[in-house]
């Protein structure tokens, strides 16, 4: 039986992970739950799952939860802050960690799980975007196991031979006959909207994704296609892919989740309904398969598949991310930080939808001008750069 810590338990991925665990209760035990500040949701989860350990991102949230758990006679040990989240990520009695904290906040807890040699179910793409080679090196050094949860990376993973699956970050695609990885994306809710109308997009419009059920931040990232840009960077690191081996294609139906093209002309595609329980179940049970509770794909109802090349005039954030990917670690760390600040400002109605790309571009240029030769050889140096990029972004937001 696998023993789980779920980081980001109150979010969309956390909910889907618990759904798979419930579907297969004889194979998974939930030992620890970690979350941000959603005390009410965490209380619900604690009442249902009765974890031994819980961590909340802030002390006030942890204190409030402690009182509520005591009132309900739930005897869970409650931790707080980043240290608390890191603690439950490296518990001796846990072998598998779902890393689903959104954004840069997930980097240190995820790295704690890596250093403890856990099986990492990586849903937090920002951790790899921010730390790149440092993360890949740590996985090897500490004997951790890395399995990708993002539907696209999980699809690519499933289409690759086992010798690559067990050597992520260090594999040789060319040696295994892979000519290219085709990273698919839906194009978000505005793929057919006139570019001139994007300035008027509201947060409510941006988070209404046509195919997937996701949290607000990733929904906005999907609308700008920054999500695909971050996934591009993540795929570069996971699969050790060169620029020539990595391509993005828009597939509005979200049925094909990504593809791998081989030298002999074969293309392997992973398909399924757009439901995160499928890739989550794949990583939770790897190399076996378990019931995810997802309806089987009915090809008689799927309809036509369409594929479109991405339009960078419509999706400038995607172009920024692809460019940053090959400029260096300073560029991807800085861009990720800028984007988190810009998306938060947009969701708070402080800036326009189209300002997100402008702010990201301004910060990327500033980071590249000031930190191109910076030695990013530790988590501390990455976090310092992340903070500086956020400061640049906040300055740009205040000027809008």
Swiss-Prot record:
UniProt record similarity statement: Belongs to the DXR family.
Name of the coding gene: dxr
PANTHER family associated with the record: 1-DEOXY-D-XYLULOSE 5-PHOSPHATE REDUCTOISOMERASE, 1-DEOXY-D-XYLULOSE 5-PHOSPHATE REDUCTOISOMERASE, CHLOROPLASTIC
Binding-site positions, 1-deoxy-D-xylulose 5-phosphate: 125, 151-152, 186, 209, 222, 227-228, 231
Superkingdom: Bacteria
InterPro entries: DXP_reductoisomerase, DXP_reductoisomerase_C, DXP_reductoisomerase_N, DXPR_C, DXPR_C_sf, NAD(P)-bd_dom_sf
Cofactors (names): Mg(2+); Mn(2+)
Alphabetical list of Pfam families matching this protein: DXP_redisom_C, DXP_reductoisom, DXPR_C
Chain positions recorded as NADPH binding sites: 10-13, 36, 38, 124, 126, 215
One annotated GO molecular function: manganese ion binding
Pathway terms, separated by semicolons: Isoprenoid biosynthesis; isopentenyl diphosphate biosynthesis via DXP pathway; isopentenyl diphosphate from 1-deoxy-D-xylulose 5-phosphate: step 1/6
Role according to the record: Catalyzes the NADPH-dependent rearrangement and reduction of 1-deoxy-D-xylulose-5-phosphate (DXP) to 2-C-methyl-D-erythritol 4-phosphate (MEP).
Catalytic activity, as annotated: 2-C-methyl-D-erythritol 4-phosphate + NADP(+) = 1-deoxy-D-xylulose 5-phosphate + NADPH + H(+)
Broadest EC class assigned to this enzyme: oxidoreductase
GO BP terms, alphabetized: isopentenyl diphosphate biosynthetic process, methylerythritol 4-phosphate pathway involved in terpenoid biosynthetic process
Protein name per UniProt: 1-deoxy-D-xylulose 5-phosphate reductoisomerase
Keywords: Isoprene biosynthesis, Manganese, Metal-binding, NADP, Oxidoreductase
Keyword Ribonucleoprotein annotated: no
Assigned EC number: 1.1.1.267
Binding residues annotated for Mn(2+), in chain numbering: 150, 152, 231
């Amino acid at each position: 039986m696998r023993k789980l810590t779920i980081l980001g338990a109150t979010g969309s991925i956390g909910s889907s992970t618990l759904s798979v665990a419930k579907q297969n209760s004889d194979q998974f035990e939930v030992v620890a739950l970690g979350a941000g500040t959603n005390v009410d949701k965490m209380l619900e989860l604690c009442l249902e799952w009765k974890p031994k350990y819980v961590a909340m991102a802030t002390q006030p949230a942890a204190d409030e939860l402690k009182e509520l758990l005591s009132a309900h006679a739930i005897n869970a040990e409650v931790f707080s802050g980043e240290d608390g989240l890191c603690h439950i990520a490296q518990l001796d009695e846990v072998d598998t960690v779902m890393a689903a904290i959104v954004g840069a906040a997930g980097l240190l807890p995820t790295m704690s799980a890596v250093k403890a040699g856990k099986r990492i179910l990586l849903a937090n793409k920002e951790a790899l975007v921010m730390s790149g080679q440092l993360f890949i090196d740590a996985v090897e050094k500490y004997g951790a196991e890395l399995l990708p949860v993002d539907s696209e990376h999980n699809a690519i993973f499933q289409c690759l031979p086992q010798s690559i699956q067990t050597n992520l970050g260090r594999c040789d695609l060319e040696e295994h006959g892979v000519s290219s990885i085709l990273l698919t994306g839906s194009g978000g809710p505005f793929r057919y909207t006139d570019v001139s109308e994007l300035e008027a997009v509201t947060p409510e419009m941006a988070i209404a994704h046509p195919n997937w059920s996701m949290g607000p931040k990733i929904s906005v990232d999907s609308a700008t296609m920054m999500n695909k840009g971050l996934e591009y960077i993540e795929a570069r690191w996971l699969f050790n892919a060169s620029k020539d081996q990595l391509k993005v294609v828009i597939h509005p139906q979200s049925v094909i989740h990504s593809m791998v093209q081989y030298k002999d002309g074969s293309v392997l595609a992973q398909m399924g309904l757009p439901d995160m329980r499928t890739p989550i179940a794949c990583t939770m049970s790897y190399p076996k398969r378990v019931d995810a509770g997802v309806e089987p794909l009915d090809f008689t109802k799927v309809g036509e598949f369409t594929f479109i090349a991405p339009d960078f005039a419509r999706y400038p954030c995607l172009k920024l991310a692809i460019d940053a990917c090959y400029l260096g670690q300073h560029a991807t760390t800085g861009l990720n930080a800028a984007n988190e600040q810009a998306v938060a400002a947009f969701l708070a109605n402080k800036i326009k939808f189209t300002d997100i790309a402008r702010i990201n571009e301004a910060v990327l240029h500033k980071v590249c001008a000031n930190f191109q030769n910076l030695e990013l050889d530790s988590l501390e140096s990455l976090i310092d750069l992340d903070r500086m990029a956020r400061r640049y972004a906040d300055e740009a937001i205040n000027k809008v």
